[in-house]
Amino acid sequence: AERPSLYDMENQLSEMKVQTLIVVGDEDDHCLQPGLFLKRTISASGLLVLPKTGHTLNLEEPDHFNRFVSDFFSMVEHGRWLDRDPRSTPSEIMKTE
């Protein structure tokens, strides 16, 4: 079976309500754009870009990675990881009244 493109799943992803932490390394060129796409598409998501890391950022910077993931879990557990403020979307930011 052919694997669908991530971008073809935008509607399904936009319906996700689970808290999501998207983590990419700033030197992982192939994952930066998909990471931004996921951040824009999943309302309860956050994007963490670790500097000077590639695709294996959990191995390259394990202390940083573990700290951020632990903080994410703590925020979710304590109800502090909220959906994105709808006013922050590009269509809302560019509105003129």
Feature annotation, model-predicted:
Residues 1-12, 18:
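Active-site nucleophile elbow and catalytic-triad environment of alpha/beta-hydrolase enzymes
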Residues 8-9, 34, 49:
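Hydrophobic alpha-helical segments typical of transmembrane helices
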Residues 15-16, 22-24:
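Short beta-strand/loop motif that positions the catalytic acidic residue
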Residues 45-97:
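Catalytic active-site module of serine/aspartate enzymes centered on a nucleophile-bearing elbow/loop
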Residues 10, 36-37, 63:
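Active-site phosphate/pyrophosphate- and oxyanion-stabilizing loops and adjacent acidic/basic residues
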Residues 29-35:
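Conserved alpha/beta-hydrolase "acid-adjacent" motif
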